[in-house]
UniProtKB/Swiss-Prot annotation:
Chain sites annotated for binding Mg(2+): 191, 216, 241
InterPro entries xref list: Enolase-like_C_sf (IPR036849), Enolase-like_N (IPR029017), Enolase_C-like (IPR029065), Mandelate_racemase_C (IPR013342), Mandelate_racemase_N_dom (IPR013341), MenC (IPR047585), OSBS/NAAAR (IPR010197)
Native source organism of the sequence: Geobacillus kaustophilus (strain HTA426)
Recorded family membership: Belongs to the mandelate racemase/muconate lactonizing enzyme family. MenC type 2 subfamily.
Job description of the protein: Converts 2-succinyl-6-hydroxy-2,4-cyclohexadiene-1-carboxylate (SHCHC) to 2-succinylbenzoate (OSB). Also acts as a N-succinylamino acid racemase (NSAR) that catalyzes the racemization of various N-succinylamino acids, including N-succinyl-L-valine, N-succinyl-L-alanine, N-succinyl-L-methionine, N-succinyl-L-tyrosine, N-succinyl-L-serine, N-succinyl-L-isoleucine, N-succinyl-L-phenylalanine and N-succinyl-L-leucine.
Annotated protein name in UniProt: o-succinylbenzoate synthase
The EC number(s) this enzyme carries: 4.2.1.113, 5.1.1.-
Catalytic activity line of the entry: (1R,6R)-6-hydroxy-2-succinyl-cyclohexa-2,4-diene-1-carboxylate = 2-succinylbenzoate + H2O
Cofactor(s) annotated in UniProt: a divalent metal cation
Gene3D superfamilies noted in UniProt: Enolase-like C-terminal domain, Enolase-like, N-terminal domain
Amino acid sequence: MAINIEYVILRHLQMELKAPFTTSFGTFQTKELILVEAVDCDGVSGWGESVAFSAPWYSEETVKTNWHMLEEFLVPLLFSKPLRHPAELPERFAAIRQNNMAKAALEGAVWDLYAKRLGVPLCQALGGTKKEIEVGVSIGIQPTVADLLQVIERYVAQGYRRIKVKIKPGWDVDVIRDVRRAFPDVPLMADANSAYTFADAKRLQALDEFGLMMIEQPLAADDLVDHARLQPLLQTPICLDESIRSYDDARKALDLGSCRIINIKIGRVGGLWEAKRIHDLCAERGVSVWCGGMLEAGVGRAHNIAITTLENFALPGDTAASSHYWERDIITPEVEVQGGLIRVPNAPGIGYEVDRRQVERYTQFAKVFHRTATA
């Protein structure tokens, strides 16, 4: 089936978070993002979302660099020759090094359009089978431990299946001890966002007593070797996030023993197809995966739900309810969590309608790129 995309619209959105979100590398009050709309010859739209932040805290990509890459390189490559399947795009984009979040945003829009043309949910087009997915919640660094415990209590009461607490030097062992004392039976993990070095091994070993599901990305964002040295010293499984940008990164990490769990983020690895390949590799190796979050708006959240329906996404992901982050999301219905579960939509494509009124409300500027004139 040919995918005949006539034009692409890039929209720069700015959305206000309901509450500040703090990690080891910064505090976020607003989220900028690029919404990608790919429209075919029959007027059917597919939607994708860039998950890059406004500054290069998480990776070298930013909203501005993503816009540049999409405008100058990726959209022209999309239009450069006929396309029959979204899985062709990674090879087409391979000449562009890195810039995975920009690639994923455009590829995601094409996948959504492709599934809609087939008349099937995106999850089915990807090979997913689950009808509902388990979800956890990610909680940023709070002003005080008392504040953190109060936030956790609220989300435990809402039924979230796993609590993730951000940590950094000075906000780690004692904090996790207080959390575990208050919530002895809650599935709990810690996320360091690369805040430590191998010299901190003894401090990280001190987390073993709390029965954590995992510690996420304790060491440098580009490291595999020191994680492989650290993992045998810990009872707690290491989960890699920032270090895994591709199938080959995942293969090397598993070969080295750098981790026991992998967090798959669609944007970080360059799109849905690469995410699926990493999922399949981990399934073959007996390594569980889960879907991480990047403060996505509704379109990105919908893509996360779709990929999580693959069988080896065996651990609760970060795809919390829309209301966890936004007063009003850009999709309808919004993503809702009931008893720690999200019911997977069965409508074609991402399964949610994009609320164009809300999109217009949040849009700062936009640009249209036609097949016949990509500038």
